[in-house]
Amino acid sequence: MNMPLMIDLSNKKVVIVGGGKVATRRTTSLLAYTNHIHVVSPTITDTLQKYLETKQITYEKKHFEPQDVENADVVIAATNQSDVNNDVGAALSKNVLFNHAGQADLGNITFPNFLKRDKLTISVSTDGASPKLGQRIIKDLKDTYNEDY
């Protein structure tokens, strides 16, 4: 069972394995909270390439190897290959925060939908049961809590 928790990522090393759409979404979300994001993937999206060019992320063009996640505080497995995502999880020590983008129950953290308005943060999670519902709830909350909050 997951408990909502706010965490300071500013000094945490984040490694994202994968360079596609899901990895891009996770990276985009995390950039507001840390500048220590390292991506490992044979290819990356245009958006990730732009982040690399503007020095917002670091990148290794390669296939995953267990040593890629050594010394990481947060690891996200976001490839389109479940066996690689599973290998990422297997390479981690128990104290690492791990998100398995393909199967949330194989990780120990998830990414809820959230709304941020200055000091107000509202997160919504369906524990993976209905991501569309979570998105709809956040959309409704955006209408209620506009940029003035």
Q: What do the predicted segments below correspond to?
A:
Residues M1-L9, F111-P112:
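A short, basic/flexible loop-to-alpha-helix module at the beginning of a structural domain
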Residues L5-R26, L133:
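Glycine-rich adenosine-cofactor-binding loop
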Residues D8, K116-Y149:
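Adenosine-phosphate binding glycine-rich loop
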Residues G20-V22, D83, G128:
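Residue-level detector of alpha-helix initiation sites
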Residues Y33-Y51:
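NAD(P)-binding Rossmann-fold cofactor-contacting core
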Residues S41-D46, H63-F64, D83:
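Short, polar loop motifs at secondary-structure junctions
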Residues E53-E70:
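Glycine-rich, highly charged phosphate/nucleotide-binding loops
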Residues V74-A78, N85-T110:
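ADP-ribose/adenylate-binding Rossmann-like module
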